[in-house]
Amino acid sequence: MTSRRPTKVEQFAIEAKLNLILGAEVYDRVFQGFEVLEVVNGELRGWCPSEHRAAVIDVQFSAIVAWIAQTMLNQPVRRVNVLMRGMRHDEREQPA
């Protein structure tokens, strides 16, 4: 099982690319507070401040998030899974 957490610099780079590509209005409305937790076996796991924002990212922006993350992290991202902050993705693989 391959797991990788982004550094702070990589996290800021992902946020900056999202802001650049989507525009400030969309970024502020949807991605404010978005955080990439880790990439595990091609699955990007992230948190958002609200369940609504997490659902919007999953449904409308997962392809863009995957593309940006895999270019920033130099690792394939095949799936994006975003939950509300504090919820668990999978207990066995939850970051400490």
Question: What role is predicted for each listed range?
Answer:
Residues M1-A96:
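Intrinsically disordered, low-complexity basic tails and flexible linkers associated
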